[in-house]
Amino acid sequence: MVQTTKKLSILATFLFCALVFVACGDSGSSSVPDEFTDPIITPEEPPLDTITEPDTTTSDSVETYPTSFDSAGLHTYILENGVSSGNLYIFYPADSFLTKFEIGDIVTVAIVGYDTLEMPVVEKTSDVPIAHFLFSAVAGSNFVSLSIHNDSFSDVIGITAQNAPIEVNISLKEKGGFLFGLEMRYVQYLDVYPERYPELSVEEYANFREIRTTGMGEKKLYRSSSPIDDCLGRNLYVDSLAKEAGVATFINLTDTEDYARTYKDFDSSYYATQNVIYLSLPVEFYSRTFKDGIVKGFRFMIEHEGPYLVHCIYGMDRTGFTLAILEALMGAKTEEIQADYAKTFSNYFNVVDGQQVTLNEQQVDFFKAVVTRNLRAVYRADGIDIADADDIDWATPTEQFLEKQGMTKEEISALKDRLK
């Protein structure tokens, strides 16, 4: 039995001795890692996730349409060959753009006839959290671009090449407004060894916890890192904690069933004896695949008894977003949703010189803002606008969101009954 009140420095020798340091990869058919950028186990530079080069073989030229760069910003057009690989490309030299704007600025991008969005100016997709919009400007490039980290900007906005030319106006929203966000890339070092986390309990190290936000019943819903994937060195802890909590139904957001069964010790795990649905979802919150997948998972919860546990690999992005939806559905307040989401990052990051350094308040606040920003953005993409305020009702728009994904009012009510 895992004793959950003691520090890991005491427990490591008898619970963790068989676990080995293994670099994590994704599993199942999902090809995108579960990440903010890829959480880094060794202190190396984050990978350079460059924007795909656009197809410039067509004859359209930006000179065909009026382009100006004045005190108000850049006024230009997206052409037919600027809609490519899910991104929107503006054929305006990045070096010229960077004479007025700088990396780390936040800009307002008005895509005339479609939407007006705020996003940071960065170089690569991994400079921003999962599902965030970004304006990429890489010195030396003959273009700048609009993208979403791990999703298709053009699909989310509803733009195809046939819609071109499309007028775009870019203006400054906040000078240096995302500089702290860029610094946050360098707190993402984690470790598989429990002795690196002397201040964490077993539950915290395993990223295992019960969800007790407003409206959620006692011992109804849990979240964690993977109970079966040994790449983070936490699976045996999670499996033991899940057994202790009496978890009866697992929602596996990451694996296929066939892949899950290849994990070491899977057959002898508590996990293997319980109800499990294997969803193998990409980290693409706007995508039809992801939305259909979580609905499938929610229906599985309706059909099976709890307690329930939702997990991916880290229990971070896919799990964090899915749990935010369930918390919002049950009536959680903004601060509760944010605090639960940010807790995961406090449990993993920030290992420096072999020991975790507790995240400061500003760093925690950064992660808190990520989850509600993602909820608003994904809901908005489905036509559900939510005020940018803290004291809002999340339950009603969440029910609307689930209905748009095909759930009936009766199913939503049944899901809520399971979680009360």
Model-assigned labels for residue ranges:
Residues 26, 30-33, 40-56, 150, ...:
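Cys-dependent protein tyrosine phosphatase-like superfamily
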Residues 20-23:
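C-terminal motif of bacterial Sec signal peptides marking the signal peptidase cleavage site
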Residues 2-12:
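Bacterial N-terminal signal peptides that target proteins for export
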Residues 314, 318-319:
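Ser/Thr-glycine-rich phosphate-binding loops at phosphate-binding pockets of nucleotides
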Residues 58-150, 154-156, 161-169:
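Long, compositionally biased stretches
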Residues 309, 313:
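Active-site cradle of extracellular carbohydrate-active enzymes
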